[in-house]
């Protein structure tokens, strides 16, 4: 962490779990580390990145207590972060999409405080932390981008706390769907149609709701004509109606990452 502190549309495709991302011609680089780097700096970063083989569904990327060796940039697929309580209960803390980086929360103690597990087949870029830290000390733009990404993660965590403490069940689920819509849109996918890569149980765990409540609310939203649900696929029919269900005017929650 020493060097980080020192610098201290129409026609879009439907997300289906298979968008690959590459540094040189990345279409969503503004969401990842390469954003703002010039060609020479990008080459230096590219040289330290290890492009791993596919991570299979349910495979764990790292476990709580593991030493921080690398930061992981998701190229495709979805990964969830979660902790396990002393009583053995899982608590999901985040869902990571292509373009997201996983592992920043380990910098404080240099070990991971949570688990990271693939919800579907995923591809990641592994970025050795020591080398990244060294490069960040030499490349101001890289350092600034890393700080920006870390700040965004903190902001998202704060908004999630507000969501859980101030919103009722209906508002939580509506905000979750709306946030996914915005995140997929930022990645070049359709904001209107997308696939839920997480189970309803996972969604309920994340939002502090039961599976039955999630199913009931999805049915209610569908009856209202706000969304259509076909298995794991969601279609937003009435965006303004969905936003109204979030109670956004009351809570001012954005929840984009």
Swiss-Prot record:
InterPro entries in the record: cNMP-bd_dom, cNMP-bd_dom_sf, Env_Response_Regulators, HTH_CRP, RmlC-like_jellyroll, Tscrpt_reg_HTH_Crp-type_CS, WH-like_DNA-bd_sf, WH_DNA-bd_sf
Binding-site list for [4Fe-4S] cluster: 23, 26, 32, 125
Location in the cell: Cytoplasm
DNA-binding region (UniProt annotation): 200-219
Record-linked Pfam families: cNMP_binding, HTH_Crp_2
Residues of the HTH crp-type domain: 167-240
Record key words, sorted: 4Fe-4S, Activator, Cytoplasm, DNA-binding, Iron, Iron-sulfur, Metal-binding, Repressor, Transcription, Transcription regulation
Positions of the UniProt region annotated as Dimerization: 143-162
Swiss-Prot/TrEMBL cofactor(s): [4Fe-4S] cluster
Main location: cytoplasm
Gene Ontology cellular-component terms listed: cytosol
CDD domains: CAP_ED, HTH_CRP
A molecular function (GO) term: DNA binding
Chain intervals for the UniProt region annotation (Essential for the oxygen-regulated activity): 23-32
Cofactor: binding comment: Binds 1 [4Fe-4S] cluster per subunit.
PROSITE patterns: CNMP_BINDING_3, HTH_CRP_1, HTH_CRP_2
Description of how the protein assembles with itself and partners: Homodimer.
Primary role: It is involved in the activation of genes necessary for anaerobic respiration.
Protein name as catalogued: Anaerobic regulatory protein
The organism's taxonomic lineage, starting at the top: Bacteria, Pseudomonadati, Pseudomonadota, Gammaproteobacteria, Pasteurellales
């Amino acid at each position: 962490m020493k060097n980080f502190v020192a610098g201290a549309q129409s026609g879009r495709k439907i997300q289906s779990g298979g968008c690959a991302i590459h540094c040189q011609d990345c279409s969503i680089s503004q969401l990842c580390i390469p954003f703002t780097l010039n060609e020479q700096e990008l080459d230096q970063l590219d040289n330290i990145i290890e492009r791993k083989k596919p991570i299979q569904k349910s495979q764990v990327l790292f476990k709580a207590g593991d030493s921080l060796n690398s930061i992981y940039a998701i190229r495709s697929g979805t990964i969830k972060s979660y902790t396990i309580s002393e009583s053995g209960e899982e608590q999901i803390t985040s869902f990571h999409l292509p373009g997201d980086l996983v592992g920043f929360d380990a910098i404080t103690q240099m070990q991971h405080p949570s688990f990271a597990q693939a919800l579907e087949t995923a591809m990641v870029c592994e970025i050795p932390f020591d080398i990244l830290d060294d490069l960040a000390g030499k490349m101001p733009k890289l350092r600034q981008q890393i700080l920006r990404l870390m700040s965004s993660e903190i902001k998202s965590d704060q908004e999630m706390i507000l969501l859980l403490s101030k919103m009722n069940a209906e508002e939580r689920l509506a905000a979750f769907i709306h946030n996914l819509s915005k995140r997929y849109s930022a990645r070049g996918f359709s904001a209107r149609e997308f696939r839920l890569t997480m189970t309803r149980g996972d969604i309920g765990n994340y939002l502090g709701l039961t599976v039955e409540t999630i199913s009931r609310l999805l049915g209610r939203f569908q009856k209202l004509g706000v969304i259509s649900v076909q298995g794991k696929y969601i279609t937003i029919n009435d965006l303004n109606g969905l936003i109204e269900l979030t109670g956004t005017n009351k809570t001012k929650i954005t929840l984009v990452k």
